[in-house]
Amino acid sequence: MAQVINTNSLSLLTQNNLNKSQSALGTAIERLSSGLRINSAKDDAAGQAIANRFTANIKGLTQASRNANDGISIAQTTEGALNEINNNLQRVRELAVQSANSTNSQSDLDSIQAEITQRLNEIDRVSGQTQFNGVKVLAQDNTLTIQVGANDGETIDIDLKQINSQTLGLDSLNVQKAYDVKDTAVTTKAYANNGTTLDVSGLDDAAIKAATGGTNGTASVTGGAVKFDADNNKYFVTIGGFTGADAAKNGDYEVNVATDGTVTLAAGATKTTMPAGATTKTEVQELKDTPAVVSADAKNALIAGGVDATDANGAELVKMSYTDKNGKTIEGGYALKAGDKYYAADYDEATGAIKAKTTSYTAADGTTKTAANQLGGVDGKTEVVTIDGKTYNASKAAGHDFKAQPELAEAAAKTTENPLQKIDAALAQVDALRSDLGAVQNRFNSAITNLGNTVNNLSEARSRIEDSDYATEVSNMSRAQILQQAGTSVLAQANQVPQNVLSLLR
């Protein structure tokens, strides 16, 4: 080996080994201080990617476990509200059993019904106000999806149902004794002013078109004559002047005659056939037998009130009265009877004018329409029958944009048939939902247990890849420290080797 002083190869070799031991010492200290075997991707590129996927899965499962606990909480909140509803239903059933006893007086039944109504109102309040984190759990049918896994589609659904007196079928529950409804046909001398001259001046073109719906031509009463059918006690006129598409509207129409001789054409009038025996009349006919005229006026009044013309056929004016459990007769007002249905009405005994009581409401298209007030519907209470055929209880009118009317009062309460059966069905409905909520809580508990086990196993697997083995790292640190000390000492010796060349220069 040549003796040189410009390059000290032994010193360079010693420095290189010293750097290696210093790097090993730094790595060992970093791992011991952080607790991690992988502090950056350079420590273990593949291991870092695997450990990161484990971390994402572990964090997702941990959050899923918290979600499942939220699911349990909302199910418990809902089930607690249902328990209160169940308590109210049990009391309602108890009261219904009490009401079935014939020893109860009418006042007893009224008191029982009052408490039942309050209990049902409380059920509605609980249904409308119970919420979890802003979600009303019983106010409407709803499905809540709870994420119980770290990946898409790993969910459990909570099916919530609207539970109130209406969905339970108890909104019209009534245990009061039914009233016996009676009606007495009203017979009146509709036109008493015999000799009054008939006046058709009101049946001008505008009035006729408004009543018949025609628009083409100039309509008028042919000859200005009114004809009277003595057999049916009806008045008729012949209308002409319609042209074009409305020419078919020319013909005979039945008209109404007031006591002052005024002749009017009912709204929605349709063409009819005048009896062959009808004769021209210039004066009001005094009628001795008036039911047919009353019936015609009643029909027209119902049609004006929004009732279908077919349903209004055969309508008659009747006086209503009710007999309670104690045999007391309660006089009611007038009604228009059409088949087995009754509609509230006003009747002017002086003039014979008949008018159906109506309620205005806003239809789905935003237009204001008129509906007749039907008495004694399926639940025994006043109902509103709209022009589109839908029927609403008066008590629910506010929910359908009806304008309040004093006529919408309870007419005749009808006792609910088989009330205990209806209440039992309601209890079964509540029990079914409570069972579903109990079952889903058990599912959540099972999911939480499984999530915990999975998180533990994944954490152990990640630890084997990512965490420091302190026994190994302490050993590595000790070895590196010894090598550092030895390397430093040897480097000092190696740096002295070039001085040997000086002995050759002496």
From Swiss-Prot:
This is Phase 2 flagellin. GO terms for molecular function: structural molecule activity. Coiled coil: none annotated. The gene is fljB. It comes from Salmonella typhimurium (strain LT2 / SGSC1412 / ATCC 700720). Flagellin is the subunit protein which polymerizes to form the filaments of bacterial flagella. Keywords: Bacterial flagellum, Secreted. Pfam families: Flagellin_C (PF00700), Flagellin_D3 (PF08884), Flagellin_N (PF00669), FLIC_barrel (PF21504). It is found in: Secreted; Bacterial flagellum. NCBIfam families: PRK08026.1. InterPro entries: Flagellin, Flagellin_C, Flagellin_C_sub2, Flagellin_D3, Flagellin_N, FLIC_barrel. Belongs to the bacterial flagellin family. Individual Salmonella serotypes usually alternate between the production of 2 antigenic forms of flagella, termed phase 1 and phase 2, each specified by separate structural genes.
